[in-house]
Amino acid sequence: MSMLVDVSYFISGPRQIRNATTAKMPTAEGLSANNVIYGYIRSFQRKFLNDVVGFTLAGQITDYLEIIENESPKTENDTVSPYEYVCRQLRESFADYVFYHILRDMNTDATVTGLIQLKSSNKHVSPLQRQVSTWNTMVERNKQFVCWASSDECPFKVNVNKNLLIPINSFNL
């Protein structure tokens, strides 16, 4: 499956995940972190696209991503696909969406008797607060996408799920 984002969105900055790397020869920890990230991207990409552009366009974008993965590199004279314009608008928002889900899932560990909250000696920021701020950043990016999609610059009609436009708080209200 071709992906809207890759691990490079998670190696530095506010979405940094420890040990994530773009190195050609990653360490075992780097490889493990990258595999987790790619697993989340694969798991959530189609749902995100369905929710942010609608089912039909999500399928077309997925097909486009498959095609460009198998094509030879573009030259300066090649025209940019209308799908690429949409992908460019969505990449940062999708990276936030993936990071939100990683934070949510990595904060607890499932056992037979229930969920256990993980403790860490190097915990500096409450995972819940980080989740809230990541979600709300994604919401702001999605609102910008809606403005762009409503303009003449967007080559497609999109149908955004309103849940992706609603900020959250630490009380889940």
Question: What are the residue ranges of the model-derived segments?
Answer:
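Conserved short "hinge" loops at termini or chain/domain junctions
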Residues: M1-R91, D105-T113, Q117, H124-S133, ...
